[in-house]
Amino acid sequence: MHKVEHGVSCAGCPHRAAYIACKEALGRGKNKVICGNAGCSATGYMHPAATTCTGGEEALLPRYKKEVPNGGTVDQPAVEACIHFALDTEVAADDAPRHFAGLAAEGAITILAVMVSSRAFLGAEAIEELCQHMVEDLRIDDVVAVDPLDTLACTDILRDMLERPGVHAVAFCSPCVQLQGDRAPEPVDIDRIACVGCHRCKQITGCPALVFAPPAYTVDADVCAGCDLCTSFCRTHVIYSPRVRIAPTERCEMRYQAATSHS
């Protein structure tokens, strides 16, 4: 298993996948903001955009470090749309109602993107209780639990939420790759003869398991955690997964089984 680096997302990190889905759904615009914390207890604080930056938080350019919008009110929110990342432990904390009291003033449409990946939330009951807590105590209009590594489904759900004013929440549920240990799914593979070296997989994901060895990419099998995220972004379809015929729901279950058995 790849050693954790401070400020850098691990290969297979579900927080990276969550950011990519949010970025794809939100699009660009100065009144559209992705902010908050997408790190973890091991990496420390990370701006969501840093999860796809090759050098992590330290290398992320200032123009990408969007801060939580302020100066708005419930009647006149600060921006048009805001996706505010937070860790499951932050949302479950006793001071969460105070900490997240300003969500409605951040954006006309605000989505609280909760990274549900820590050891305390490996069970369905714990996840359900967290979602209920968001509705009852944080005054969230609606909460949807999704698998961040099911990219297409995530993006569709986020786009639907971004059409509706108010405060919503998405619980991105997939266990931390470090909890899966050596039981993580098998790594992907790249056909180096067919790979055109376009860099798209690396530019979009920033995954440390993707290594450019001119003229093509290769996968560091000792680092890859078999999350399959990169397979969604290869235009020439030369990144091969052993799980190609397995449905996203089953892949998610495999990760949870690995995490619970390893823990």
Q: Which role does the model predict for each range below?
A:
Residues 1-6, 40-48, 79-80, 113-115, ...:
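Gly-rich Lys/Arg/Thr-decorated short loops/hinges at beta-loop-alpha junctions or inter-strand turns
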Residues 1-20, 142-148, 172-173:
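Phosphate/pyrophosphate-binding active-site segments
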Residues 1-16, 220-223, 238, 248-262:
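Conserved acidic/glycine
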Residues 7-8, 78, 117-157:
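Conserved thiamine diphosphate
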Residues 17-18, 41-45, 90-93, 118-122, ...:
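Flexible loop/turn segments at secondary-structure boundaries
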Residues 19, 32-121:
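Thiamine diphosphate
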Residues 21, 196-218, 225, 229-248, ...:
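Iron-sulfur cluster-binding cysteine motifs and their immediate structural context
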Residues 137-183, 228:
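Structural signature of the thiamine diphosphate
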